[in-house]
Amino acid sequence: MTDKLIIFDTTLRDGEQSPGASMTKEEKIRIAKHLERMKVDVIEAGFAASSNGDFDAIHTIAGLIKDSTICSLARANDKDIQRAADALKPAESFRIHTFIATSPLHMEKKLRMTPDQVFEQARLAVRFARKFTDNVEFSPEDGSRSDMDFLCRVLEAVIAEGATTINIADTVGYGVPELYGNLVKTLRERIPNSDKAIFSVHCHNDLGMAVANSLAGVKIGGARQIECTINGLGERAGNTSLEEIVMAVKTRKDYFGLDVGIDTSQIVPTSKLVSQITGFVVQPNKAVVGANAFAHASGIHQDGVLKARDTYEIMRAEDVGWTANKIVLGKLSGRNAFKQRLQELGVSLDSESELNAAFMRFKDLADRKAEIFDEDIIAIVSEESALAHEQEHFKFVSLSQHSETGEQPHAKVVFGVEGKEVTGEARGNGPVDATFNAIESEVGSGSELLLYSVNAITTGTQAQGEVTVRLSKSGRIVNGVGTDPDIVAASAKAYISALNKLHSKDDKVNPQRS
């Protein structure tokens, strides 16, 4: 009988710490529903004490998700833990994840605490968390750079207090596979009560070894939980990639001897959703979910795949949710056909009004674009769902622009400001620059444009463009996304979406990193 590997997803918490990846409550809910559909074991929905917005998102997700355990991060103090417990009350199954730094560097320079003080705070934090649930996780932050004797002492104490999961954090991505795997192994061997807890690994990708270190923690160290994010999303170089972990363990079950309960057909749809929401485009050569992951350019490889796919493919594209572009609907398709296709794609909308709005967007697109693909439908629904829940201080209405070779383009943008239509006009160094200048001529947001990117949703010259705009103001970074066959119109929509997020400010306490 094989062991079960627990998949702990922290896209909504650690992934969101990536600059520019902050999500609204509604965006978090959409991702959480996809993670549940994927059958993720544990969803870390956020850090409840960081802000009222994060508390509310965790509380709502806890009430909606039934098939995954919902978790909140909490620093090792009563206030944070109480806040996490309150946020998690609606959940059918929940976990409190508390942590404190244990490395000499962090204790001295950041916490300004002695080892004995850290030991006592860790022990008491777990004891307090156990008052709310018997599912308590403890992480020694910067565990991979901690003194072994002290680490063993702390972990033995928190297990004695009732911690059921011990998560060894390689917070700065310093570990290498053999050493990290042996660290986990040594801890399990030296701690007398280690058999009372499941050991977990949490690795960062600063040296490009997050996945390798995590797998070593499992194979060498005996860990049975991996903490990871969709697309490896996370601050600095990112976190361990969920899709790579899952497919490595499934594809090489002969080596790892572990079962994972993930529905792998949901991997690519979830990857695309996270990319669309955060604006972090997946690189084409990214394992499993990159556009080129199953592409073969070499003639020898193409010949082999045509004769027998397993000559050059160790997993099937359809097993992870890749589907060929497929024309599914046209301008004569009705509302019922549209609704049925959404159900087939596993896409849900919260209300009939959202469905009606999405259908009208579809009909408008069908009048302008001869071929409608699944990807087009997903983009329409994603944007419509975001608009339905977005605080629409600003609303795009229309755009016209004119340019001639050798002259600065001119743009005129009509948009709503709290229900009142205004018109902005301006010139710029290109049609997009002119469009943004036209919006700012009326808004005067004072924000800085950090990123502008365009991604074709499907192939061909009629493809919709998906534009991501990243704005920064007063240290706050937000993303806006817009889609349209007209790239300049998509750009205006994305810019206005980002402005709406800047307008609905939700300040967060910056947590210690785990």
From Swiss-Prot:
Write out the GO cellular component annotations. Answer: cytosol
User: Which Gene Ontology BP terms does the record give?
Assistant: L-leucine biosynthetic process
Q: What is its EC number?
A: 2.3.3.13
Q: Which cell locations does it reside in?
A: Cytoplasm
Q: Which UniProt keywords apply?
A: Amino-acid biosynthesis, Branched-chain amino acid biosynthesis, Cytoplasm, Leucine biosynthesis, Manganese, Metal-binding, Transferase
| Positions of the UniProt region annotated as Regulatory domain | 395-514
What are the names of the required cofactors?
Mn(2+)
Q: What are the binding positions for Mn(2+) in this chain?
A: 14, 202, 204, 239
An example of a Pfam family matching this protein is HMGL-like
**Domain annotation Pyruvate carboxyltransferase: ranges:** 5-268
Under the heading InterPro entries, the entry gives: 2-IPM_HCS-like, 2-isopropylmalate_synth_dimer, AIPM/Hcit_synth_CS, Aldolase_TIM, LeuA/HCS_post-cat, LeuA_allosteric_dom_sf, LeuA_bact_synth, PYR_CT
Query: What role does it play?
Result: Catalyzes the condensation of the acetyl group of acetyl-CoA with 3-methyl-2-oxobutanoate (2-ketoisovalerate) to form 3-carboxy-3-hydroxy-4-methylpentanoate (2-isopropylmalate).
What is the protein's name according to its record?
2-isopropylmalate synthase
